[in-house]
């Protein structure tokens, strides 16, 4: 159906923009939202990812448009590994993940022009090889960890640390494409 309402991406992530382009979706505008991303008491990583995606979609000022928002949480058990604040924290995160399996949960939410919000959480399990201190130091020095949940980006050099994935690769990168396309189309969005 030509003439679909515009699509706003409520995210500053260049990776999400690149992922959307892979499936032929180019947002009409990028408008990151600023919300409180503090984890609530007893909130699971899945609940956190979903809530943040929904709140970002709701907070975007885009009347009459579709709004797409997402949030990725890296969890080791019930511990969230957010975006590393500095090189020391990035190295600490990599030491924690070294030789272990962890979860990447991406919550994706779409707000229709009517205001209706639909959302889904997509979970992937990632296993990392045991990392040497030299590998950790080199990766941290590269700066590739900046702005990435868990202090690493699977689509870059850290992809060489991953021994197994169970689930959606694009959810690990930051936007599960199959689920995103399904949510958009389910609400009537057409390119």
From Swiss-Prot:
CDD domains: Maf. It is an enzyme of class 3 (hydrolase). Its cofactor is a divalent metal cation. The keyword Cytoplasm applies. Signal peptide: none annotated. GO terms for cellular component: cytoplasm. It is found in: Cytoplasm. One of its GO terms (biological process) is nucleotide metabolic process. The record marks 15, 72, 155 as: Important for substrate specificity. The active site is at 71 (proton acceptor). InterPro entries: ITPase-like_fam, Maf-like. Keywords: Cytoplasm, Hydrolase, Nucleotide metabolism. It comes from the Bacteria. Its EC number is 3.6.1.9. One of its GO terms (molecular function) is dTTP diphosphatase activity. Nucleoside triphosphate pyrophosphatase that hydrolyzes dTTP and UTP. May have a dual role in cell division arrest and in preventing the incorporation of modified nucleotides into cellular nucleic acids. PANTHER family: BIFUNCTIONAL DTTP/UTP PYROPHOSPHATASE/METHYLTRANSFERASE PROTEIN-RELATED (PTHR43213), BIFUNCTIONAL DTTP_UTP PYROPHOSPHATASE_METHYLTRANSFERASE PROTEIN-RELATED (PTHR43213:SF5). Belongs to the Maf family. YhdE subfamily. This is dTTP/UTP pyrophosphatase. It comes from Hyphomonas neptunium (strain ATCC 15444).
């Amino acid at each position: 159906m030509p003439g679909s309402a515009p699509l706003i991406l409520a995210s500053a992530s260049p990776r999400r923009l690149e992922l959307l382009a892979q499936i032929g979706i180019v947002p009409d505008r990028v408008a990151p939202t600023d919300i409180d991303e503090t984890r609530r008491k007893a909130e699971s990583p899945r609940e956190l990812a979903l809530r943040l995606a929904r709140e970002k979609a709701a907070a975007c000022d885009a009347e009459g448009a579709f709004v797409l928002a997402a949030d990725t949480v890296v969890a080791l058990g019930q511990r969230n590994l957010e975006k590393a604040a500095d090189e020391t924290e990035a190295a600490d995160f990599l030491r924690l993940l070294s030789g272990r399996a962890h979860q990447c949960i991406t919550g994706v939410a779409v707000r229709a022009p009517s205001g209706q919000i639909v959302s889904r959480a997509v979970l992937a399990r990632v296993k990392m090889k045991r990392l040497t201190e030299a590998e950790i130091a080199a990766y941290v020095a590269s700066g590739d960890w900046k702005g990435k949940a868990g202090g690493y980006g699977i689509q870059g050099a850290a992809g060489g640390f991953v021994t197994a994935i169970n689930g959606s690769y694009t959810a690990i990168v930051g936007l599960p494409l199959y689920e995103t396309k399904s949510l958009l189309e389910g609400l009537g969005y057409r390119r």
